[in-house]
Amino acid sequence: MFRAQSNIFDDVVVKATDENLTSENWEYILDVCDKVGSSDTGAKDAVAAMIKRLAHRNANVQLYTLELANALSQNCGIQMHKELASRSFTDAMLRLANDRNTHQAVKAKILERMGEWSEMFSRDPDLGIMEGAYMKLKTQNPNLRAPSKPQKTQISDSDRQKEEEELQMALAMSIKESKGATPSAAKANAPQESNAGSSSQAAPAPQPVQPGTTAATVSRVRALFDFQPSEPGELQFKKGDIIAVLESVYKDWWKGSLRGNTGIFPLNYVEKLQDPTREELEKEAQTEAEVFAQIRNVEKLLALLSTNTQAGGGDGRDNEEITELYHSTLAIRPKLIELIGKYSQKKDDFTQLNEKFIKARRDYESLLEASMSQPPQPSYGSRPPYGYNAPPPSNYTGYPPSSPPPQQYGYGAGAPPQGSAPQYPPVGANPAFFMVPPAGEQRPQQQTPQPGPPSDPYSLPQGRVPIGGRPQSYAPQELATAHYDSPVDNRHSFAGPSQPQGAPSAPQGYEYPPSQAPPGYPPQQGAPLQGPPPGQQNPYEQISSPPTHQQPPSDPYSQPPPQVGHGYPPQQPAHAPPAPPGASSSPAPAQGYLPYRPPGQAPSAPPVGGGGDEGFYR
């Protein structure tokens, strides 16, 4: 009969602020707005329903109610503004903000919404109650409103120097304290620490880090407000988080690490934490020891309760032992919860550190494998190619020359210089083979070496064939061999025209040195034999490279093997070619093998010391 009249907005407001919602449901919120506009008392009834929801102990319900009130203020006109600025609604929000059991996020949201409404209602003097309530809330709770972020200005050189000086001073003080600390001093300071601990409960609220403080003397800070990053590289944290300080980045921004994440944060959002002293560390160790000491009592209590239950005993409160064990173990529960939170945070930090280390190791191994799979790049230049009959490049580095380059001749190259007497064949221990040019060819001229750049001690001499390359001359080449395996050219193995006894046996300028005479024979006496006049053609051509085999001196008793009748037929006719004009027409005496001489060339006599008819056999 005297029951209060029900509010028609209770159901729709409860539906829009349900604690099971995962986010604001704007469909339900707009339904409340439409219903408020359809009734004359809708604004008053809706605010009354929201005051009831603000008294709910669930933080989500309180946050959804504040969001609903903000939507009504923007969509329901001046009548809703008057109800929101009423004494009843503002007092309800102040009670909620000053309640110590209220969640910090709810308090911050109340301060935020009251600030927005104060600005919105500032043009109407009848709505000044909201502004007064907002100023009162700011005065009573200065830490509710997050400050504005400072500007990111670069640290000057003087600030860097100051930070370094503070770091050196802190290190010196730490070393001094570690050396001067003694167990007796620790015991003497114990009562003072206990007194300080008792008086610390009445300490004032923590203050943010003062501007200008350097990161050299600060290792940890505690967050005073929630911080949401607005730019890349900023560190997100919640109020109460402990952040490890790494370094100073900007003047009022430090770099820190929290739960494996690294970023910068503003100094006015955190407070400085002192490093734990030795007494604090000992106290933490003592607390852990007390908790672990109760493990045996907890296990004993479980065993007694299990036995009592299986035996069908009466009320457990009658058992004094069970009651005593229960109360003794119940005292460690707050300490146990604190240790669980402490080591859970450490476990998360170590887990994230391990994940970072694993990632770094994988990146390093992949980088190492990639570098090993690529072939090493040569640090020197490759040998430039060059063509035939061309000298090597001047910048090419080869082996030092061991001897001057040999003279090279080719067909059609002209006669050698007049200042040098040609040698047929070259003077040496191992005369090389000689090739007879075709009839009518000009005598090849000697190619004089062209002056080039200064000799390089590692350059390849001209005229030598580089290893793995081809000769630079088109002249045919053969290797000198011993007399027992020298090939015999059957095409030129017929007897030449008759020769007088005094005809020379070697070309112009050929002299058998005394040191090269065959063993058992005296050295040659007299002047060297003279060759044909300079105008006469030379049938010999010097090869471009010296012989590579050592040839023993020719043996005058070495003769070609006799021609066997059953051998291959000769490839050339056995008759002598027609004698050239001016040559003797007498028949050739019977003799051994003689080299072929072209027409117009004076026949050669047996070499000096050659032993008669045997001659020099190749």
UniProtKB/Swiss-Prot annotation:
UniProt GO cellular component terms: endosome membrane; ESCRT-0 complex
Gene that produces this protein: HSE1
Domain of life: Eukaryota
All residue ranges annotated as the SH3 domain in the record: 216-275
UniProt biased composition (Pro residues): 549-563, 570-581, 596-606
Residue ranges annotated for the VHS domain, each copy included: 16-145
Keyword Cell wall biogenesis/degradation: no
PANTHER family linked to this entry: JAK PATHWAY SIGNAL TRANSDUCTION ADAPTOR MOLECULE
Residue pairs linked by disulfide bridges in the UniProt entry: none
Name this protein carries in UniProt: Class E vacuolar protein-sorting machinery protein HSE1
Transmembrane parts of this sequence: none
Function as written in the Swiss-Prot or TrEMBL entry: Component of the ESCRT-0 complex which is the sorting receptor for ubiquitinated cargo proteins at the multivesicular body (MVB).
Membrane topology label: Peripheral membrane protein
Region (Disordered) residue spans: 139-165, 177-214, 369-618
CDD domains tied to this protein: GAT_Hse1, SH3_GRB2_like_C, VHS_HSE1
Family, as annotated: Belongs to the STAM family.
Keyword vocabulary terms for this entry: Endosome, Membrane, Protein transport, SH3 domain, Transport
Feature: compositional bias, Low complexity: 196-214, 495-509, 582-593
Any GO BP: protein transport to vacuole involved in ubiquitin-dependent protein catabolic process via the multivesicular body sorting pathway
Pfam families in alphabetical order: GAT (PF03127), SH3_1 (PF00018), VHS (PF00790)
Originating organism: Phaeosphaeria nodorum (strain SN15 / ATCC MYA-4574 / FGSC 10173) (Glume blotch fungus)
Subunit structure: Component of the ESCRT-0 complex composed of HSE1 and VPS27.
